[in-house]
């Protein structure tokens, strides 16, 4: 993208997204919000498409969004926002003002610096202990947002905090892995060759035992371009079955994760 300061310039920049298009569709997943009484940070993934009927042209895209909020006179307002374009498909002429991401070959000399650097911009850095006052289900669901962000941004330090020391899982295509050290090491090597990743997903079900401090959740993997049935029902290309343990109030870690490919809609989702 590009840098803009001031309300009017930011609004004008967003208006360009529709300037050459008849249709603009965007959906958001992987939501996170954390903060205090007057300041907060947020992140989410966005995917969608821009279309031009007269050209029968379409541009598909996936983005990572993070930013900060301030509360003034009882109203929360956007203070800053970073938008990184992860991937695009289709007719680039519909968004010539966008700064395209590196190609499938990865970074090359002359490429611009990335918009988001997780080690500096991850929303969990500003308020590492900001969630105890929210319902436990939100804290549990947030674990997937943190996990997917860390993996997709190749932030292994943040990813390590997502897992308990005794964690294990069936991580396709790597297989069964036991122990946080082996999990993070395997993910680091698996992630290294890929110029980008983006794991869009919805948390579908959570069951927790507050007294024991354990939980289980089902997460549906969203596939942009095939995310809904014809009648609008959410559609998923795979699911995660995850078990978690509370480390301290408001913070949960994964103890087990397994990834299972296979299409299903929201009405027939796997259950905990």
Residues of each region from the PLM?
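Short, low-complexity N-terminal intrinsically disordered segments enriched in polar/charged residues
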Residues: 102-149, 153, 161
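A solvent-exposed, acidic/Ser-Thr-rich amphipathic alpha-helical stretch
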Residues: 1-48, 156-225
């Amino acid at each position: 993208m590009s840098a803009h300061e001031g309300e009017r310039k930011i609004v004008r920049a967003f208006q360009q997204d529709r300037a050459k298009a008849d249709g603009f569709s965007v959906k958001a997943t992987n939501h996170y919000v954390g903060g205090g009484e007057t300041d907060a940070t947020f992140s989410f993934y966005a995917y969608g498409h821009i279309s031009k009927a007269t050209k029968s042209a379409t541009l598909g895209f996936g983005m990572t969004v993070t930013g900060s909020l301030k509360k003034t006179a009882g109203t929360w307002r956007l203070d800053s926002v970073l938008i990184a374009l992860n991937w695009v498909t289709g007719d680039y002429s519909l968004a010539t003002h966008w700064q395209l991401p590196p190609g499938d070959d990865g970074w090359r000399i002359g490429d611009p610096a990335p918009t988001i650097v997780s080690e500096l911009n991850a929303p969990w850095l500003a308020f590492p202990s900001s969630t105890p006052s929210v319902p436990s289900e939100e804290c549990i669901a947030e674990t997937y947002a943190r996990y997917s962000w860390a993996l997709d941004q190749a932030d292994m330090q943040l990813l390590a905090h997502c897992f308990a020391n005794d964690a294990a899982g069936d991580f396709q295509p790597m297989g069964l892995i036991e122990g946080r050290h082996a999990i993070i090491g395997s993910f680091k090597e698996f992630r290294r060759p890929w110029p980008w990743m983006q794991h869009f997903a919805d948390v579908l079900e959570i069951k927790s035992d507050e007294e024991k401090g354990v939980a289980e959740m089902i997460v549906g993997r969203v596939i942009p371009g095939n995310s809904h049935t014809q009648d609008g029902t959410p559609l998923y290309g795979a699911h995660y079955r995850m078990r978690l343990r509370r480390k301290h109030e408001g913070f949960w870690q994964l103890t087990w994760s397994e990834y299972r490919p296979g299409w299903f809609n929201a009405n027939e989702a796997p259950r905990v």
